[in-house]
Amino acid sequence: MVFRTYVEKRQGLAPECEALLTDCRDFLGVQGLRAARIWNRYDVEGIEAPLFENACRSVFSEPPLDLVSDAADTQDACAVFAVEPLPGQFDQRADSAAQCIQLLSQGERPRIRTAKVYALYGMLTDADVEAVKRYVINPVESREASLAKPETLAEELAEPKRVASVEGFTVMDEAALSALLSSMGLAM
């Protein structure tokens, strides 16, 4: 079973939201943005409900600073999107949380996936929302995530294609190397 929780900094203790708001207005020119909220979303599989409840209070959040909920309150938001690391990209937040839960339980390490959920408030056009997404999502390390709760966190990865092997590379002359570069689309 997959458990999900959302953790948000308390109002007045959320500098990341303030920084996003300032950057969007000043650098992106998104003047219609009046507020932003950010949640850290944790999906956890491989633990029992009592351990998950304990982890919500002791691993995923700092009770004096954070609000923990089962759902992100995005009722009046004009746009909501989530950002997660690309598959294969190391997720330090998820790994650290999994290690902490393993220490708490003295058992197996659970599977954890994290994402940041952004809610934007104000009068925004589709172009404004896309500009904010482009600003927040670094395509080298992250992608837009689904807002739906997954059935499982097990990854199903496709078998990678066979990599081409170049025979006789070390004995090629300049003309053959040049032809190889252009035929394989190589840069150097």
Label for each model-derived stretch:
Residues M1-M188:
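Core nucleic-acid recognition elements
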